[in-house]
């Protein structure tokens, strides 16, 4: 079985941060939201999923969960699993029928 996984920069696996390829863009996906600073001191934020639904879910999660409480986020990255819990085939906002589960942060 083929799987996608998130890893730390040193190549070690992040616990539970993986999914079988067969479910990605179907009824599940996983995404990362990461903030970092480059050598010139500029801040960058990345939001992306294993597939397009994960990337879409990342934007919705940032808008509804992270941004309203951004001053309380003291981590550089989070990994979240999205599940199409209501089975409608659409990426819903958090709290509107789909499940968003925080998997890891650092």
List where the protein language model places each region:
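Solvent-exposed alpha-helical segments and adjacent loops
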Residues: 1-106
């Amino acid at each position: 079985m083929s799987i996608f996984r998130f890893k730390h920069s040193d190549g070690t696996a992040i616990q539970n941060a993986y999914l079988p390829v067969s479910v990605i863009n179907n009824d599940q996906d996983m995404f990362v939201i990461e903030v970092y600073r480059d050598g010139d001191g500029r801040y960058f934020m990345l939001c992306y999923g294993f597939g397009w639904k994960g990337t879409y879910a990342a934007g919705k999660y940032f808008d509804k969960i992270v941004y309203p409480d951004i001053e309380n986020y003291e981590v550089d990255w989070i990994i979240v699993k999205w599940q199409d819990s209501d089975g409608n085939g659409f990426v819903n906002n958090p709290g509107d029928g789909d499940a968003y589960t925080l998997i890891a942060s650092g």
